[in-house]
Every structure is written in C-alpha cells, then in structure tokens.
C-alpha cells in the first residue's frame, strides 16, 4: 500500500499502527528537468510539506531513529567534488532544480 506523505494524519496513523524504531525518509516529488522548470513552486511546496510532515509525525510518535536522505541538488551548481556539507548555501543552485533543491535544504 502507498502512504501519502502530504497527509500528516495518514503518516501519524501509519506510525501508530506500525510503531517503527527507524524511519528512513527518501521520498520526493520529482519529475525531471522539464517538470522542474514548469512547476518549481509545486516541487518546493510539496517536498517541504512532505519533509515537515514525516519529521513532525516521527517526533510526535517518538520514533527513536530518523534518517533523512537528501539530494546532491542541494549543493551549488559548481561545487567541488567530492561534495561536503559545508558547501551547502555557498553558491548558486542549478536553476532547473531550484524548487526541489530549496525544499531539500529546508528539511535537512
């Protein structure tokens, strides 16, 4: 079955029923470059909402461990390789992924 991470109550109910010790958040609204360009606000808002919902519900239900997988889109477009967390917010993001990238930054 699927769980809609945009619906806080659904997440809360899932956590109540399943009582996990660990939540791994790897979900994201994605769609490729064309979709990112055409719908940047959707990618920003829905990814932020999912992140807030799953973090908040996990905290409310006292989940012991939480792993948040993010994205290389969080890093400036001209970042040095290998990437390191201190590079986040140090330069311009890739414009075609900006909404998604900002959402991932805000929920990391």
Q: What are the functions of these language-model segments?
A:
Residues 99, 103-106:
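Active-site helix of classical SDR
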């Amino acid at each position: 079955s699927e769980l809609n991470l945009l619906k806080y109550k659904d997440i809360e109910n899932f956590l109540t029923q399943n009582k996990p010790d660990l939540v791994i958040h790897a979900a994201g609204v994605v769609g490729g470059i064309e979709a990112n360009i055409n719908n940047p606000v959707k990618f920003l808002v829905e990814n932020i909402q999912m992140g807030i919902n799953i973090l908040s519900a996990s905290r409310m239900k006292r989940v012991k461990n939480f792993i948040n997988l993010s994205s290389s889109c969080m890093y400036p477009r001209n970042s040095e390789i290998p990437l390191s967390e201190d590079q986040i917010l140090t330069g311009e993001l890739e414009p075609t992924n900006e909404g998604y990238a900002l959402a991932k930054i805000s929920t990391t």
